[in-house]
Structure formats: structure tokens, C-alpha cells
């Protein structure tokens, strides 16, 4: 959403409003930056009416509401944190594993990979199919429905006695629900949040993922001493509480004003905007915001209903944005974060930490705590800078981690872990934790932010679903094949992710524009104007430009690519 940062008194209240719609507003002459627009009296310029920017303390209510929506991330994180422990618990292995000749039980790599990773396939399918509920019934009702589907999957898992394929089916169904959540939660937040804290509020989704992972680890640690199905049924049973909390929260969350405008529910859209921005329903800036949304929706209506074919259109640059979203979400998985969580147990064992549950808790704490940093930096420094910094820092960490593992950890080879170097192990632990910090403060939350901000309303649900599905598919491939790969090449696997991280850095620099401080409609305008991504941070929307603004300079660059990077 937009904000009023100009024509205000010292305390952020409007001084004068001279127009009621964005189409009637004149433009400022000072375009020093997107978020610092001033009235220039010498040139008699007046800013467009925008929703006022208030102190962050004024947005406590909307932050809590968005946190309720973001709780969908907790549901996903809880599954990630608990399933990693289930496959190591004795009762789970006895019920769903295979029996050896001596009567003991085990889970093969194939069965483990299927049980853990099939959830991601369910998420990919659910993200594509169930996200349509958001367009049909609204984002809030859509979220309630997919949470109920998730609960059905949990019931099937809890009811499983000793048939692994029953548990397998339950995970597919719960994955369908989580896939729908992963699309609708960031979508609702991005369409409801005030624009100057939108990145922060969308990042709540990742914060809830890490919180769910951490609490899942702690719950596994608490139930590991039991010898019966309490080990895994109690953590699954708690999912009912999470579902009830989220459905109840949706009763208090305002519906997306963009969805409401699309359904011609204008008064409700105005109330939603007023509630999210903590302003009066009668505030002219609310009407101006609705006018801006109406203009965008009307333009999309004139173009006709969106089809799958339109996703591949290059005229509106939807296809370019779809590819960008798919690659951003794929790269998030290819950072290697799951590799660290999988292989972390081996590293920690090398320095005497034999309890894999303790290992998980340590990594979970770093992951969760670091996400608070991301909530601050995403709107402070912008999306591009955070993604570029994250890719560069993770590359450095991965080089050290893999190199020490290959050359120093096991001096007598991987077949003799008993001779592991404690110093090398300590070094790798430090860089593993620093790597997780870098991931949690950059690619973990900001991938969702970029995808949620990049698409026009008419194709948003479809594009977000496809982009998010690419994340789930790579999650499945990573989860299924990592045990086989690490057992074959050990720490050399880190160099594969290092190559992906280098590719990520260059891709972001050349193809991902900055969207910090822009409304979703202004993001659409920037794409249509063909602004070069590395110049996008200097771009100003047409409603805020002066007569001397040169948009052509942002569409071309005479400098070689390596100078542009510098």
C-alpha cells in the first residue's frame, strides 16, 4: 500500500489534501528517492495524496493481524522440524520400517526419502490447484479451506498403525494444504500490508517457518524418551491446535482490498485499507488508494480473463516475471540450506555431540534468531542488496565449509570418522552456523517477498503458485537425493551448492529489480517501462516525477556489464 510522506506535519499527519484520486494528482519536483518526496513551492508542485506513514509503533495491530496470516509458515515449519525426528525414533521405525533377519527394524534410504520428501510434491500440487480458492472465495476463506485439508492429512497420519503407505498418503494430503497456505499467506499479507513495511510483514512468513522448525525440534527432544507412539503422535496431535489458531485468526484479518475491488465490494475495500493503515475510513487518501487499485483492476478487466496462455506472454512481461519467480524460488532451495540441516549431525558428532536432537536444536536456534534480522533489513536496505549480500556471504561460507571438510576433517578418509579432527569440526560448526545466519537474513524470507510483489492481480495467483511449486519440487529432489549424494561424495557436495550460489549472485544483479517502497501497482508500471534491474532503485513512479525526470536513462546502460556491477 502507499503512504503519505509529503505534505505532512512533523508528527506525520496530513497538512493539506488537494485531490481525491491518483489520476488527478500532480507530481513533485524533487525525486531524490522513492520514499523521501517533498513539495517544491518554487515550482508549485503538489504531491499525490498518499496514505500517511506513521511510526512503526502505530502498526502494532496490523502487524499482529499479518502475524496470524503468517502463522501458515509455522504449520510448514512444524512439519519440517518434526519429521526430521520421526525417522530417527524407535517406535516410528518399528511401525513403518523394514525388518532385518535378526528381527530389528530400519528405514531404508528410499523409504526415508519418500516419507520425508513426498510432502513437497503434495505442496507443489496444492500450491498450483488450491491457490485458485483465493481468487474464487477470497484469500481469507481460501486459507481456512486449505488448513482444513491439512487437518485431514494429519488425521490420516495419526491413524496409521503399521502401514507406511497410509502414513505416506497422509503426508501427501497434508502437503496439499500446506502448498495452498504457502501461496495464499504471502499473497494476503502483500496485498494488505502498508507498502513501507510490506517487506517486513511478508518476512513474518519465514519467521514463522523457522519458529515452527525450532519448536518441532524441541518437541521431538521432549518425546524421544518415550518408547511408544507418543514419540510421534503427540507432535502430530498438536497440529490440531495450530489449525484452530489459524482459522480463528482469519476471522479478524481484513480481506485483501485488491480482491474486494475485483469483486466490486468497494466499501469493504476502503474499510480494509483504513484498518491496515490505521486511518479513518473517510480519509481522502483511502479513496485515492482505492482509485489506484480500481484503475489497475479495470485495465485488467478490459484485457479479458487471464488464461494460462497469458503467462507466456512477453508483451506484458508476465513471462519474464514468471521465470524470475521460478528461479528465485528454485535458488532458495539450491542455496544448500537443507544440506546443512541434513549433514549437520555428522559435523557435530565429530566434536563429541552425539545427540542428533541437540544438534537440530542448535541449528534451529540460529535459524530462528537470525530471521529477526531479516525482518529489519528487508525494508531498510531493499530486496536486491539483501539477496546479493546473502549469495556472496553464503558462497564464502560454503567454500570454507566444504574445503575444510574435504581436506581436514577426516585425515584418514571418510571411512575412518573416528579419527576426525576436532579443530576442523569446530571450524565447520562455526561456518555452518554463520551460513545459516546468512541464509535466514536474506534468501529465506526475501524469496517470498520478491515473488509476492512481482505479479499483476489478474495472474498473481497462477504465477505465485507456479513459482512456489518450483520451490517444492526442488525441495523434494534435495530431500530425496541428498542422503545418497552425501554418502557418495561427502563434503564435495558443498562445491555443487557453491556453484549455484555464484549463479544466483549474477542472476539477481542482472534480472531482479528493486521493489522496496513501491505499491504493487507501481511495481507493475516499473516492469512495463523496462527499467534495468541494476538501475531500478533509482526509478520513480510516474505520479511522483518532475518535468526533468529521464526514464530513458534507466532503460539503457552504455557501460560494460562488469562496470555496471561495480
Swiss-Prot record:
Residues bearing glycans: 88
Q: Give the CC-aspect GO terms.
A: plasma membrane
Sorted alphabetically, which InterPro entries does this protein's record hold? MFS_dom (IPR020846), MFS_sugar_transport-like (IPR005828), MFS_Sugar_Transporters (IPR050360), MFS_trans_sf (IPR036259), Sugar/inositol_transpt (IPR003663), Sugar_transporter_CS (IPR005829)
**Where does the sequence pass through the membrane?**
62-82, 113-133, 141-161, 167-187, 199-219, 234-254, 334-353, 358-378, 386-406, 429-449, 466-486, 493-513
Region entry Disordered, spans? 1-39
- Give the keywords, sorted: Glycoprotein, Membrane, Repeat, Sugar transport, Transmembrane, Transmembrane helix, Transport
Membrane topology (Cytoplasmic): 22-61, 134-140, 188-198, 255-333, 379-385, 450-465, 514-566
**Where can this protein be found?**
Membrane
What topology in the membrane does the UniProt record assign? Multi-pass membrane protein
Keyword Isomerase listed: no
Q: Which Gene3D superfamilies match?
A: MFS general substrate transporter like domains
SUPFAM superfamilies for this protein: MFS general substrate transporter (SSF103473)
- Comp. bias regions, Polar residues: 16-32
Identify the Pfam families for this entry.
Answer: Sugar_tr (PF00083)
Can you name this protein?
Hexose transporter 2
Amino acid at each position: 500500500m502507499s503512504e503519505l510522506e509529503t505534505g505532512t506535519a512533523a508528527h506525520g499527519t496530513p497538512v493539506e489534501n488537494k485531490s481525491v484520486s491518483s489520476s488527478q494528482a500532480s507530481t513533485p519536483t524533487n525525486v531524490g528517492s522513492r520514499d523521501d518526496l517533498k513539495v517544491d513551492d518554487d515550482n508549485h508542485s503538489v504531491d499525490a495524496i498518499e496514505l500517511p506513514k506513521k511510526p512503526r509503533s502505530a502498526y502494532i495491530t496490523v502487524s499482529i493481524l499479518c502475524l496470524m496470516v503468517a502463522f501458515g509458515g509455522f504449520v510448514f515449519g512444524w512439519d519440517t522440524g518434526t519429521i526430521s525426528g520421526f525417522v530417527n525414533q524407535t517406535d516410528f521405525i518399528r511401525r513403518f520400517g523394514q525388518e532385518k533377519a535378526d528381527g530389528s527394524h530400519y528405514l531404508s534410504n528410499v523409504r526415508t526419502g519418500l516419507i520425508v520428501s513426498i510432502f513437497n510434491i503434495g505442496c507443489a500440487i496444492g500450491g498450483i490447484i488450491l491457490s485458485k480458492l483465493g481468487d474464487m472465495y477470497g484469500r481469507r476463506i481460501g486459507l481456512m479451506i486449505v488448513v482444513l485439508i491439512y487437518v485431514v492429512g494429519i488425521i490420516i497420519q495419526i491413524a496409521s498403525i503399521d502401514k507406511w503407505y497410509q502414513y505416506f498418503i497422509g503426508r501427501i494430503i497434508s502437503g496439499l494444504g500446506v502448498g495452498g497456505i504457502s501461496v495464499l499467506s504471502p499473497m494476503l499479507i502483500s496485498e494488505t500490508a502498508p507498502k513501507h513495511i510490506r517487506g517486513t510483514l511478508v518476512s513474518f512468513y519465514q519467521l514463522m517457518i523457522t519458529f515452527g522448525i525450532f519448536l518441532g525440534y524441541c518437541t521431538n527432544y521432549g518425546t524421544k524418551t518415550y518408547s511408544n507412539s507418543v514419540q510421534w503422535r503427540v507432535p502430530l496431535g498438536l497440529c490440531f491446535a495450530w489449525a484452530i489458531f489459524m482459522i480463528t485468526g482469519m476471522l479478524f484479518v481484513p480481506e485483501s482490498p485488491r480482491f474486494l475491488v475485483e469483486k466490486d465490494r468497494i466499501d469493504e475495500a476502503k474499510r480494509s485499507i483504513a484498518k491496515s493503515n490505521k486511518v479513518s475510513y473517510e480519509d481522502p487518501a483511502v479513496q485515492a488508494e482505492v482509485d489506484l487499485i480500481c484503475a489497475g483492476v479495470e485495465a485488467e478487466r478490459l484485457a479479458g480473463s487471464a488464461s494460462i496462455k497469458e503467462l507466456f506472454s512477453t508483451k506484458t512481461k508476465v513471462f519474464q516475471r514468471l521465470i524470475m519467480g521460478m528461479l528465485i524460488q528454485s535458488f532458495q532451495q539450491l542455496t544448500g540450506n537443507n544440506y546443512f540441516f541434513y549433514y549437520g549431525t555428522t559435523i557435530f558428532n565429530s566434536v563429541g555431540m552425539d545427540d542428533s536432537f541437540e544438534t537440530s536444536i542448535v541449528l534451529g536456534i540460529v535459524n530462528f534468531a537470525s530471521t529477526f534480522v531479516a525482518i529489519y533489513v528487508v525494508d531498510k536496505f531493499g530486496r536486491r542488496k539483501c539477496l546479493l549480500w546473502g549469495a556472496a556471504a553464503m558462497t564464502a561460507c560454503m567454500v570454507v565449509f566444504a574445503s575444510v571438510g574435504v581436506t581436514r576433517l577426516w585425515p584418514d578418509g571418510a571411512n575412518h570418522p573416528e579419527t576426525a579432527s576436532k579443530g576442523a569440526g569446530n571450524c565447520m560448526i562455526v561456518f555452518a552456523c554463520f551460513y545459516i545466519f546468512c541464509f535466514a537474513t536474506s534468501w529465506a524470507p526475501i524469496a517470498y517477498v520478491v515473488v509476492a510483489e512481482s505479479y499483476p492481480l489478474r495472474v498473481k495467483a497462477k504465477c505465485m503458485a507456479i513459482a512456489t511449486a518450483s520451490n517444492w519440487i526442488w525441495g523434494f529432489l534435495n530431500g530425496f537425493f541428498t542422503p545418497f549424494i552425501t554418502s557418495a561424495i561427502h563434503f564435495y557436495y558443498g562445491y555443487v551448492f557453491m556453484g549455484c550460489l555464484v549463479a544466483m549472485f549474477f542472476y539477481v544483479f542482472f534480472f531482479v529489480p528493486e521493489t522496496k517502497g513501491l505499491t504493487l501497482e507501481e511495481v507493475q508500471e516499473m516492469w512495463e517501462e523496462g527499467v534495468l534491474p541494476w538501475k531500478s532503485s533509482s526509478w520513480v513512479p510516474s505520479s511522483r516525477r518532475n518535468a526533468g525526470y529521464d526514464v530513458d536513462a534507466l532503460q539503457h546502460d552504455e557501460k560494460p556489464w562488469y562496470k555496471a556491477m561495480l
